[in-house]
């Protein structure tokens, strides 16, 4: 029996598997069954388009650099980190491999690394992308051996007779079992011994340094043996709790912040029985009836990246000065490649506070109307009652910059099937409107379609997907 989705359910699917759907795409896919739409989403994400950059002198060994080149390398590192951020943001807004990029964004938070080492960061990002719809166990192994993770969690300093427990702790607490689940402090200490000797070469390739490894017998999670780091990861994957913990995180991210234990057990069993095949668990999730339950639609607060990409993508927005993307990410508290700590971004209601709410509500107007934003990087306006208004305005103007963008309104408007208020509201907004929002919408002029759309995207309800 062919099951069809209504427009609201299709939009829900496309927001959760990506960053929304254009009216043009909606017209095409609404003719398909639910299974056909989902199969198409997977087919479009078959390929993995790696990010690539030229790193110049950063590829040289630090010992081979002159004093002047070392200073240049420090500056280049910061520059390349900014370029990497902008490069990935552009890929998020333009890619056809939307589900793969959305899952990469999820695991970018799960395997949270905060470094100013662009070569290591782009490598880790590409490792995650390659495995995003494949096997979680393979991803975990390769991520664990990546230069970024080895640097960030100090595993290069983990040596026999002087073990460093950082990675062993986080691989259990954050990457597999979850905090305080089935492991003890002794398990962490023993596992740390197994991860000794893990390192990488100058070109970023993993290397096992035998002289640094502890070859003694270890006992981890009730198993005893002369374990290596690879053995520990296999032992962690043998625990069904690992599958459950990952499925809980996937559920919160793709379905609802409120967990349904029955759904979790269904996903956990499928994930574990498939030997951690990510496509299997996503297929089951997106094809289930409960995924489209009204209580799961329009209930999640968009992350800053989801919000920014969701505004930029349908209008094919081009930023004259892409650095504004970094500024907006910083102000909204989600800067790609700079999570707050190893636990990643807290998400959910934590995205909204007094400092972020007003900017979030103004973001559509700033982006689609080239609005003015206060650019307070290094300079503040001094509070001086004697300062002349002229001087004040001169200083203030230096702090304000236009978010200079080009939005393709023509293509967006030409693909609309209807320009009446109800149709546009259903296209732009996922949840039901509040009474206050309904009053605002009823007072808007639907004949000014461009302004009406911006006003819709400035409603609190647009913050939800």
Label the predicted regions:
Residues 2-49, 146-147, 158, 170, ...:
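Cell-wall polysaccharide-cleaving catalytic domain and substrate-binding groove, primarily
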Residues 3-6, 11-25, 247-248, 252-274, ...:
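Flexible, low-complexity segments enriched for small/polar residues
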Residues 24-122, 127-130:
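N-terminal accessory alpha/beta regions
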């Amino acid at each position: 029996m062919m099951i069809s989705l209504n427009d609201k359910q299709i939009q829900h699917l496309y927001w959760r598997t990506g960053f929304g759907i254009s009216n043009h795409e909606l017209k095409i896919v609404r003719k398909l069954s639910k299974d056909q739409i989902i199969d198409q989403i997977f087919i479009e994400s078959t390929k993995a388009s790696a990010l690539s950059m030229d790193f110049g002198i950063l590829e040289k060994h630090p010992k081979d650099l002159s004093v002047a080149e070392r200073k240049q390398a420090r500056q280049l590192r910061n520059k390349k980190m900014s370029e990497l951020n902008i490069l990935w943001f552009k890929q998020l807004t333009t890619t056809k491999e939307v589900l793969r990029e959305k899952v990469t964004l999820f695991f970018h938070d799960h395997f949270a690394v905060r470094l100013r080492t662009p070569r290591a960061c782009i490598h880790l990002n590409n490792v995650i992308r390659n495995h995003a719809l494949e096997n979680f166990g393979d991803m975990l192994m390769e991520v664990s051996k990546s230069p970024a993770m080895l640097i960030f969690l100090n595993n290069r300093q983990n040596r026999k007779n002087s073990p460093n427990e950082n990675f062993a702790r986080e691989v259990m607490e954050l990457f597999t079992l979850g905090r305080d689940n089935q492991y003890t402090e002794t398990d962490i200490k023993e596992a740390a011994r197994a991860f000794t000797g893990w390192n990488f070469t100058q070109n970023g390739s993993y290397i096992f340094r035998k002289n640094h490894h502890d070859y003694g017998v270890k006992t981890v999670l009730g198993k005893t043996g002369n374990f290596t780091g690879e053995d520990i990861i296999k032992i962690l994957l043998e625990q069904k709790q690992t599958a459950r913990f990952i499925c809980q995180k996937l559920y919160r991210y793709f379905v609802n912040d409120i967990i349904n234990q029955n759904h979790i057990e269904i996903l956990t069993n499928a994930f574990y029985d498939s030997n951690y095949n990510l496509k299997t668990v996503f297929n089951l999730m997106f094809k289930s009836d409960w995924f489209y339950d009204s209580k799961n639609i329009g209930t999640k607060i968009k992350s800053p990246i989801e919000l920014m990409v969701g505004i930029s993508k349908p209008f094919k927005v081009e930023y004259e000065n892409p650095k504004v993307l970094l500024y907006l990410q910083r102000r909204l508290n989600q800067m790609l490649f700079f999570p707050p700590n190893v636990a990643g971004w807290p998400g959910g209601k934590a995205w909204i506070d007094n400092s972020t709410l007003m900017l979030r509500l103004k973001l559509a107007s700033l982006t689609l109307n080239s609005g003015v934003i206060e650019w307070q990087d290094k300079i503040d306006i001094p509070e001086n009652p004697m300062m002349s208004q002229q001087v004040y305005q001169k200083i203030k103007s230096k702090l304000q910059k236009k978010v200079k963008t080009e939005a393709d309104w023509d293509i967006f408007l030409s693909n609309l099937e209807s320009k009446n208020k109800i149709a546009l509201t259903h296209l732009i907004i996922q949840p039901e409107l509040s009474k206050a929002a309904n009053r605002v919408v009823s007072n808007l002029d639907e004949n000014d379609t461009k302004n009406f759309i911006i006003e819709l995207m400035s409603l609190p309800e647009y913050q939800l997907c």
